Amino acid sequence: MTDAPSHSMMHNTFFVSPEERAFDDVFFGEWLEAPVAFGAFEGETLLGYAEGSPESWNGRFRLSNICIFERSARGKGVGTMLLKALEEAAEASSTRMLVLETQSCNEAAIGFYKWNGFAVIGFDLYAYTNDDPERHEVRIEMGKKLK
């Protein structure tokens, strides 16, 4: 794995200008508190996005989705920058930890999260089906302390 480009270099490359949009409806309003979403663009092309929300009941911030659509953008620091944006949002919401879920079969994601300072904080052997261990698809909870 190579070093990711610096944040400032990536900022100039992929985030030309920050933009905020308001919505008439609240996505997942029943269960998400103050959700945020970030997109990485190159020109008009959406390269990827990340979204998350604070969990006030436990003082954590849950990364609910991260995806890099453009294969050409993978391994170039776009995902790391999106994680950094979520980390900054988590810190601004005074949460103590950034957490996420992945699966044991997703070795690339596990490596990416570890590269970005996350550690395994828990497992659920039967989160998806009663055959998860046999299918090598165990739910893994990963986290990164912020405070």
Predicted regions and their residues:
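Active-site rim helix/loop that mediates acceptor-substrate recognition in acyltransferases
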Residues: 1-37
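Structural preference for beta-strand elements that scaffold enzyme active sites
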Residues: 37, 60, 97-99, 141
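Conserved acetyl-CoA binding element of GNAT-fold acetyltransferases
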Residues: 59-71, 101
